[in-house]
Amino acid sequence: MSNAVQPSVTSPPVAPGGERPGRLFFHSFTFERSPSGRGTAHIVLEFAGKQWSGRAEGQSSPIGDLRLGAEAAMHAVEDFAARSLGLELMGVKLIRAFDANVVIVSATQRAARDVKLVGCYLADEDAMRGAALAVLNATNRVLGNYLTTR
């Protein structure tokens, strides 16, 4: 038996409105394909009871749909940060790893001398939603810094 002290696990404090302070939350994601082959991705993010959305539209294809999901998330993050982060989506990949589908996104933050950002998400059920969530994972630290300095 070890004598090591086990750290206690606590939940972050919850503000009176039920919100956890200091985090941008994923609210919803939708993707629609038109009969003409166009795809539209829409994401809603939430912070302190307010919502920010991002939308991306383009030609629908398996790879193009992933990019639309990621671009919609990038637009929502930039909208939340009043376009001050200088984020740019570089690429999106869906790979099979460890018997699971994983979406990986690569982005840069031009406002910080081209800092490279990478995020991933296990996307077995919905790869387009996974691409949007991978963007949120990639930008998590940048958003945390933004929130502490605003």
Question: Which stretches of residues belong to each language-model region?
Answer:
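Intrinsically disordered, low-complexity regions
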Residues: M1-S11, E46-K50, L147-R150
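Acidic (E/D-rich), amphipathic helical modules within compact regulatory domains
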Residues: L45, G49-D79
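Short, solvent-exposed interaction modules
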Residues: H75-A127
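Conserved P-loop NTPase/AAA+ ATPase motor core
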Residues: F26-A41, Q51-S53, A81, L85-R96
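Mixed-charge, glycine-accented linear interaction segment located at domain edges/termini
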Residues: S53, A111-R150
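Non-catalytic linker/capping segments at the edges of enzyme domains
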Residues: M1-A41
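Short beta-strand elements
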Residues: F31-W52, N101-R113
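Conserved active-site and cofactor/substrate-binding residues in soluble primary-metabolism enzymes
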Residues: S36-R38, G64, L68, D126, ...
